[in-house]
């Protein structure tokens, strides 16, 4: 990915984040928790990219550029934040089972999505053959939900104790 493409992705997900904040009726503490969860997963995501390249599971061509990792971290942080607000609402409604389903769905849907993107845009990322890259990618998606939601819960508190913004009928 080029710098411009990453910045466009960040802008798109920032707009999506604003929409998800509105529709989930999240209060400021929960919004800050989602951003903190995104920042925490950003560290995991950038580390996973580096580990996957070192193991030969995948290759991200721009990873040698100095500012690439910072932009990638910011991209992970912003693009994952809407997910945590959605997971928060699911957990608020369904409890631990809802969280388990979110982890499972993310783990199942994530790798095919990444493989499709890699096939469509090989200049952005390529995967090695075999089962190891797919399992590693699935693990990263499980961590996406667990790490990010865990940090959001530390910052924002338990989902069931949270009140909703705009609960006056709007």
Regions found by a protein language model. Give the residues of each.
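Aromatic-rich, lipid-facing transmembrane alpha helices and their immediate juxtamembrane interface loops
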Residues: 1-170
């Amino acid at each position: 990915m080029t710098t411009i493409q990453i910045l466009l992705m960040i802008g798109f997900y920032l707009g999506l984040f604003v929409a998800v904040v509105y529709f989930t009726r999240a209060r400021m503490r929960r919004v800050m928790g989602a951003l903190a969860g995104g920042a925490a997963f950003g560290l995991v995501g950038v580390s996973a990219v580096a580990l996957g390249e070192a193991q030969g599971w995948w290759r991200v061509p721009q990873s040698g550029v100095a500012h690439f990792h910072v932009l990638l971290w910011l991209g992970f942080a912003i693009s994952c934040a809407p997910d945590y607000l959605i997971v928060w609402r699911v957990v608020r409604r369904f409890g631990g089972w809802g969280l388990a389903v979110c982890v499972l769905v993310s783990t199942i849907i994530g790798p095919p999505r990444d493989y499709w993107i890699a096939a469509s845009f090989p200049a952005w990322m390529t995967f090695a053959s075999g089962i190891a890259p797919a399992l590693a990618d699935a693990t990263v998606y499980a961590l996406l939900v667990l790490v990010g939601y865990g940090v959001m819960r530390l910052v924002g508190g338990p989902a069931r104790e949270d009140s909703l913004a705009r609960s006056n009928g709007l």
